[in-house]
């Protein structure tokens, strides 16, 4: 005969709250201060979570060739910062958002330049008609799935490669590994940075692997 447990209502309410928080995932603290793209967490595993992004819009640089992700991101960010400060065809200033992402297509060798595209998330109020600007273009993602790994501190070229490898390894044997294998080969991984260079504590960065999910049916 099964034993029945009578749990206090307060305990049940707390349990439900904890479960709902786990399902929602841990959003970077920056997103409580400035706008970030919205997403749902559809799965979590050891060292990763799977997010579904709801059609985010980005303003992006052209491809930047460099041997350093850090240098390329700095170069791209300066262009994007000028853009949001009004250096666009409308002379329009735009609110800062997070994250700034760098899509990485690694080179074939350690001394060859990789290709980087740096992007700024366009706030919802500007998505209807984002201002054009020379050298920048709009990327509109459909509903997109990403495997995500968070890490702290300042981004470094060597550290990013290690974090990307760790995310890839954590997905092996999971139901999502095949979707990683089918991803867009022109963007092997994406680095998302949420903090200003002048913030020295509580820094949050992420590695994203964009997944090829047929029909976005999940």
Where are these regions (language model features)?
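A solvent-exposed interaction/effector surface
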Residues: 2-218
